[in-house]
From Swiss-Prot:
It comes from the Bacteria. This is DNA-directed RNA polymerase subunit alpha. The keyword Hydrolase does not apply. Its EC number is 2.7.7.6. Pfam families: RNA_pol_A_bac, RNA_pol_A_CTD, RNA_pol_L. Residues 243-347 are annotated as: Alpha C-terminal domain (alpha-CTD). It catalyses: RNA(n) + a ribonucleoside 5'-triphosphate = RNA(n+1) + diphosphate. It comes from Mycolicibacterium paratuberculosis (strain ATCC BAA-968 / K-10). One of its GO terms (molecular function) is DNA binding. The gene is rpoA.
Length: 347
């Protein structure tokens, strides 16, 4: 099995809806393979929500006007195509817009049901005069990609129901480039730089995660043909590699006090890997191994980026009684306690 170094992914947030992602190092040629796959998936396959049809009170078709409204129906529909919405519902939902003139009609005047959010309330929809009145019923559905109005035309729809083009994709723009990067003595590795811009209904980070999930599901179909087929195996991350190396360390390297060291040795715990497989209750069952010894072990493991099996991830060494984080030393009381234990052991 060929093992490749695990790439890292970093994000630089450029604006609220635009981020640049860097994936490196990639095996030669994989920058374009991964970049093109992610770009096409981001632009075409990210789920979203959009208006699929509208009904305007007193209007039978789009080629007409509404009394008291500056814009004709076609212009109103064009404005509604720019509406950015998100929906948690899998079924079609209905929103309502009711406004009496005079004044401007914006997306903020739309009343969405629970589970639906309008993300650009400042969007201009129409302008009303003193006698103007606008009542619109909007149907929102979830989907992906682009669906033309002709496909949104439902058979048997009531008179006055106007289908509109639906742009479901929440991703506006994706570009990528591949640069060369160095790994030790080799300079032919790829660095993929992906620039993603989205609508306000989704963050670039979530959009990229969605694209990655889709590709994993699809590529899994090929893997299922033979799960034992040989391929390039991705190696552990640097942090994982450090942990693996730390597991092999003898507990002598932890520089524990005499009490803690002897208790662990007597219990048959000889390496860090054997130590992190124990819980606090396991260690407390060891003779002469008390809470002070537990705290000491947790501090030493924390310095290696490790923890006991059941230790919470929020462990803070500065909260341990008798331990000075700044100097990395224990209080005199703890030292005397250990000295007393050593003398007792000798007796």
């Amino acid at each position: 099995m060929l093992i490749s170094q695990r790439p890292t992914l970093s994000e630089e947030v450029l604006t609220d809806n635009r981020s640049q992602f860097v994936i490196e190092p990639l095996e030669p040629g994989f920058g374009y393979t991964l970049g093109n796959s992610l770009r096409r998936t981001l632009l075409s396959s990210i789920p979203g929500a959009a208006v699929t049809s509208i009904r305007i009170d007193g209007v039978l078709h789009e080629f007409t006007t509404v009394p008291g409204v500056k814009e004709d129906v076609t212009a109103i529909i064009l404005n509604l195509k720019s509406l950015v919405v998100s929906s948690e519902e899998d079924e079609p939902v209905t929103m309502y817009l009711r406004k009496q003139g005079p004044g401007e009609v914006t997306a903020g005047d739309i009343v969405p049901p629970a589970g639906v959010t309008v993300h650009n309330p400042e969007l201009h929809i129409a302008t009303l005069n003193d006698k103007g009145k606008l009542e619109v019923e909007l149907v929102v559905e979830r989907g992906r990609g682009y669906v033309p109005a002709v496909q949104n035309r439902a058979s048997g729809a009531e008179i006055g129901r106007i289908p509109v083009d639906s742009i479901y994709s929440p991703v506006l723009k994706v570009t990528y480039k591949v640069d060369a990067t160095r790994v030790e003595q080799r300079t032919d590795f790829d660095k993929l730089i992906l620039d993603v811009e989205t609508k306000s209904s989704i963050t670039p980070r979530d959009a990229l995660a969605s694209a990655g999930k889709t590709l994993v599901e699809l590529f899994g179909l090929a893997r299922e043909l033979n799960v034992e087929a040989e391929g390039i195996e991705i190696g552990p991350s640097p942090a994982e590699a450090d942990h693996i190396a730390s597991f092999a360390l003898p507990i002598d390297d932890l520089d524990l006090t005499v009490r803690s060291y002897n208790c662990l040795k007597r219990e048959g715990v000889h390496t860090v890997g054997e130590l992190v497989s124990r819980t606090e209750s396991d260690l407390l069952d060891i003779r002469n191994f008390g809470q002070k010894s537990i705290d000491e072990v947790k501090v030493k493991l924390h310095q290696l980026g490790l923890s006991l099996k059941d230790s919470p991830p929020s462990f803070d060494p500065s909260q341990v009684a008798g331990y000075d984080v700044a100097t990395g030393t224990w209080s005199t009381e703890a030292a005397y306690d250990d000295q007393d234990y050593a003398e007792t052991e000798q007796l």
